[in-house]
Protein backbone atom coordinates (compact mmCIF):
# COMPACT_ATOMS: atom_id res chain seq x y z
CA UNK A 1 0.00 0.00 0.00
CA UNK A 2 1.17 3.51 -0.81
CA UNK A 3 2.84 5.22 2.19
CA UNK A 4 0.64 8.31 1.76
CA UNK A 5 -2.50 6.18 2.03
CA UNK A 6 -1.14 4.44 5.13
CA UNK A 7 -0.40 7.79 6.81
CA UNK A 8 -3.82 9.09 5.84
CA UNK A 9 -5.57 6.04 7.28
CA UNK A 10 -3.57 6.24 10.52
CA UNK A 11 -4.42 9.93 10.95
CA UNK A 12 -8.07 9.29 10.15
CA UNK A 13 -8.22 6.51 12.74
CA UNK A 14 -6.52 8.68 15.40
CA UNK A 15 -8.86 11.62 14.76
CA UNK A 16 -11.99 9.44 14.87
CA UNK A 17 -13.44 11.40 11.94
CA UNK A 18 -16.16 9.69 9.93
CA UNK A 19 -17.50 10.53 6.50
CA UNK A 20 -20.62 9.22 4.77
CA UNK A 21 -18.83 9.55 1.41
CA UNK A 22 -15.10 9.03 0.82
CA UNK A 23 -13.26 12.36 1.10
CA UNK A 24 -10.93 13.58 -1.64
CA UNK A 25 -7.26 14.04 -0.73
CA UNK A 26 -5.85 17.25 -2.21
CA UNK A 27 -2.85 19.51 -1.59
CA UNK A 28 0.58 18.40 -0.45
CA UNK A 29 -0.35 14.80 0.30
CA UNK A 30 -1.73 14.45 -3.22
CA UNK A 31 1.55 15.88 -4.54
CA UNK A 32 3.39 13.24 -2.50
CA UNK A 33 1.02 10.50 -3.68
CA UNK A 34 2.03 11.29 -7.27
CA UNK A 35 5.72 11.34 -6.27
CA UNK A 36 6.34 15.06 -6.81
CA UNK A 37 7.37 16.21 -3.33
CA UNK A 38 6.98 15.43 0.36
CA UNK A 39 3.89 16.80 2.02
CA UNK A 40 3.70 19.00 5.07
CA UNK A 41 2.07 17.99 8.34
CA UNK A 42 -1.49 18.89 7.39
CA UNK A 43 -3.91 16.74 5.43
CA UNK A 44 -6.17 18.65 3.04
CA UNK A 45 -9.53 17.16 2.09
CA UNK A 46 -12.63 18.03 0.10
CA UNK A 47 -15.85 16.56 1.48
CA UNK A 48 -19.52 16.59 0.55
CA UNK A 49 -21.84 19.32 1.79
CA UNK A 50 -23.69 16.74 3.91
CA UNK A 51 -20.47 15.61 5.61
CA UNK A 52 -19.46 19.24 6.15
CA UNK A 53 -22.77 20.04 7.84
CA UNK A 54 -22.48 16.99 10.12
CA UNK A 55 -18.91 17.83 11.15
CA UNK A 56 -19.74 21.54 11.59
CA UNK A 57 -22.46 20.58 14.08
CA UNK A 58 -20.01 18.34 15.98
CA UNK A 59 -17.13 20.86 15.90
CA UNK A 60 -18.61 24.39 15.66
CA UNK A 61 -15.46 25.94 17.17
CA UNK A 62 -13.33 24.38 14.39
CA UNK A 63 -15.19 26.06 11.52
CA UNK A 64 -13.30 28.22 9.03
CA UNK A 65 -14.66 30.55 6.32
CA UNK A 66 -12.27 31.58 3.55
CA UNK A 67 -14.17 34.01 1.30
CA UNK A 68 -17.24 31.75 1.33
CA UNK A 69 -15.40 28.45 1.15
CA UNK A 70 -16.44 26.70 4.33
CA UNK A 71 -14.14 24.29 6.09
CA UNK A 72 -12.98 22.89 9.39
CA UNK A 73 -9.57 22.48 10.97
CA UNK A 74 -9.60 19.34 13.11
CA UNK A 75 -6.33 17.91 14.41
CA UNK A 76 -3.99 17.83 11.40
CA UNK A 77 -6.89 17.84 8.91
CA UNK A 78 -7.95 20.89 6.92
CA UNK A 79 -11.33 19.87 5.55
CA UNK A 80 -13.21 21.87 2.90
CA UNK A 81 -16.70 21.73 1.47
CA UNK A 82 -15.45 23.76 -1.51
CA UNK A 83 -12.39 25.52 -2.82
CA UNK A 84 -12.95 28.55 -5.05
CA UNK A 85 -16.64 27.67 -4.59
CA UNK A 86 -16.09 24.45 -6.57
CA UNK A 87 -17.54 21.48 -4.75
CA UNK A 88 -16.88 17.80 -4.15
CA UNK A 89 -18.28 16.73 -7.54
CA UNK A 90 -15.88 19.02 -9.40
CA UNK A 91 -12.83 17.67 -7.56
CA UNK A 92 -13.98 14.04 -7.79
CA UNK A 93 -13.78 13.97 -11.59
CA UNK A 94 -11.19 11.32 -12.62
CA UNK A 95 -9.96 11.01 -9.02
CA UNK A 96 -7.98 7.90 -8.07
CA UNK A 97 -9.94 5.62 -5.75
CA UNK A 98 -8.27 4.09 -2.72
CA UNK A 99 -9.82 2.16 0.19
CA UNK A 100 -10.98 5.09 2.33
CA UNK A 101 -10.23 8.11 0.16
CA UNK A 102 -10.14 9.45 -3.37
CA UNK A 103 -6.98 11.20 -4.58
CA UNK A 104 -7.57 14.31 -6.67
CA UNK A 105 -6.73 13.67 -10.33
CA UNK A 106 -3.44 15.02 -11.58
CA UNK A 107 -5.31 17.38 -13.92
CA UNK A 108 -7.50 18.81 -11.15
CA UNK A 109 -4.41 19.12 -8.94
CA UNK A 110 -2.67 21.07 -11.69
CA UNK A 111 -5.74 23.28 -12.08
CA UNK A 112 -5.80 23.97 -8.33
CA UNK A 113 -2.15 25.07 -8.43
CA UNK A 114 -2.70 27.31 -11.45
CA UNK A 115 -5.53 29.07 -9.60
CA UNK A 116 -3.22 29.81 -6.67
CA UNK A 117 -0.01 30.53 -8.57
CA UNK A 118 0.39 34.00 -7.07
CA UNK A 119 1.61 32.15 -3.96
CA UNK A 120 5.28 31.12 -4.32
CA UNK A 121 4.71 27.65 -2.83
CA UNK A 122 2.14 26.88 -5.53
CA UNK A 123 4.33 28.32 -8.32
CA UNK A 124 7.02 25.90 -7.13
CA UNK A 125 4.46 23.09 -7.21
CA UNK A 126 3.64 24.05 -10.81
CA UNK A 127 7.29 23.60 -11.77
CA UNK A 128 7.27 20.16 -10.12
CA UNK A 129 4.08 19.28 -11.95
CA UNK A 130 5.55 20.38 -15.28
CA UNK A 131 8.47 18.01 -14.70
CA UNK A 132 6.04 15.26 -13.68
CA UNK A 133 4.11 15.64 -16.95
CA UNK A 134 7.32 15.53 -18.99
CA UNK A 135 8.55 12.47 -17.10
CA UNK A 136 5.29 10.55 -17.44
CA UNK A 137 4.02 11.64 -20.86
CA UNK A 138 7.07 12.39 -23.05
CA UNK A 139 7.08 10.26 -26.19
CA UNK A 140 10.43 8.53 -25.73
CA UNK A 141 10.81 7.68 -29.43
CA UNK A 142 10.45 11.35 -30.40
CA UNK A 143 12.73 12.39 -27.56
CA UNK A 144 15.52 10.01 -28.65
CA UNK A 145 15.16 11.17 -32.24
CA UNK A 146 15.57 14.80 -31.12
CA UNK A 147 18.65 13.95 -29.05
CA UNK A 148 20.45 12.97 -32.28
CA UNK A 149 20.41 16.65 -33.27
CA UNK A 150 21.18 18.37 -29.96
CA UNK A 151 24.33 20.01 -31.34
CA UNK A 152 22.34 21.59 -34.16
CA UNK A 153 19.69 22.86 -31.76
CA UNK A 154 22.36 24.44 -29.55
CA UNK A 155 24.16 26.03 -32.50
CA UNK A 156 21.14 27.32 -34.45
CA UNK A 157 19.01 28.28 -31.40
CA UNK A 158 15.78 28.14 -33.41
CA UNK A 159 13.86 26.03 -35.90
CA UNK A 160 15.73 23.96 -38.46
CA UNK A 161 14.20 24.02 -41.92
CA UNK A 162 14.51 21.43 -44.68
CA UNK A 163 16.37 18.92 -42.51
CA UNK A 164 19.58 20.99 -42.68
CA UNK A 165 21.15 19.92 -39.41
CA UNK A 166 24.67 20.97 -38.45
CA UNK A 167 25.56 17.97 -36.27
Which residues fall in each region the model found?
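Compositionally biased terminal segments of proteins
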Residues: 1-167
Amino acid sequence: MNEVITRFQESLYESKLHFSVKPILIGGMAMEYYGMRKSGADIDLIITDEDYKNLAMQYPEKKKDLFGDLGLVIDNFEIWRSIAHLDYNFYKKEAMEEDEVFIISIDRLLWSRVCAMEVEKYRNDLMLMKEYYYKIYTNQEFHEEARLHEKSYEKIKGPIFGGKYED
